[in-house]
From Swiss-Prot:
The keyword Cytoplasm applies. Belongs to the RRF family. Coiled coil: none annotated. GO terms for molecular function: ribosomal large subunit binding. The keyword Cytoplasm applies. One of its GO terms (biological process) is translational termination. This is Ribosome-recycling factor. SUPFAM superfamilies: Ribosome recycling factor, RRF. It is found in: Cytoplasm. GO terms for cellular component: cytoplasm. NCBIfam families: frr. It comes from the Bacteria. Pfam families: RRF.
Length: 182
């Protein structure tokens, strides 16, 4: 595994962690809360965002306007069955999701969930580093690179690992601040 490949994988891991953080509900409306909601549309699971316009008219409301009005009920059912934790209200034209304020206990739970996502991201980055170090050692063993080159590559790899784990830590601090803001 080359350094560029390892860095690319680490970058993707940071992005995946950011997406995971986006699914955590804070006290504010955010359309990305519905990213993982799949609607059983004509027998196939379809992402909600491809079936409806999702907007946030204010800080506590998400508005879902299906492109096909006949799909209102199945969209409402999919949201109810999802793990979003919000109750949809259907007025016949649009579906509204009101975001209730978070209790302090719920905020603590969400901080723990965010910390878990961050730890999963850090572990994934360390696994990428381990795989890259293994491939560097293999190259060194086969005399394809010198011992000095291998050491240099491992040092660069460690710097990348530190950089991307620090980025995940920054994202976690941001998310914790976001969750804790009343």
């Amino acid at each position: 595994m080359k350094l560029a490949e390892a860095e690319s994988k680490m970058q993707h891991t940071v992005e995946a962690t950011q997406r995971a953080f986006n699914t955590i509900r804070t006290g504010r409306a955010n359309a990305s809360l519905l990213d993982k909601v799949l609607v059983d549309y004509y027998g196939s699971p379809t992402p909600l965002k491809s079936l409806a316009n999702i907007s946030t008219p204010d800080a506590t409301t998400i508005l879902i306007q299906p492109y096909d009005k006949s799909s209102l009920n199945i969209v409402e059912k999919a949201i109810s069955l999802s793990d979003v934790g919000l109750t949809p209200s259907n007025d016949g034209a649009v579906i509204r999701l009101n975001i209730p304020p978070l209790t302090s206990d719920r905020r603590k739970e969400l901080v723990k969930i965010a910390a878990k996502y961050a730890e999963e991201g850090r572990v994934a980055i360390r696994n990428i580093r381990r795989d890259a170090v293994d491939s560097i050692r293999k190259l060194e063993k086969n005399a394809e690179v010198s011992e000095d080159e291998a050491k240099d590559q491992q040092d660069k790899l460690q710097k990348l690992t530190n950089k991307y784990t620090a980025r995940i830590d920054e994202l976690l601090v941001e998310k914790e601040k976001d969750i804790s803001t009343v």
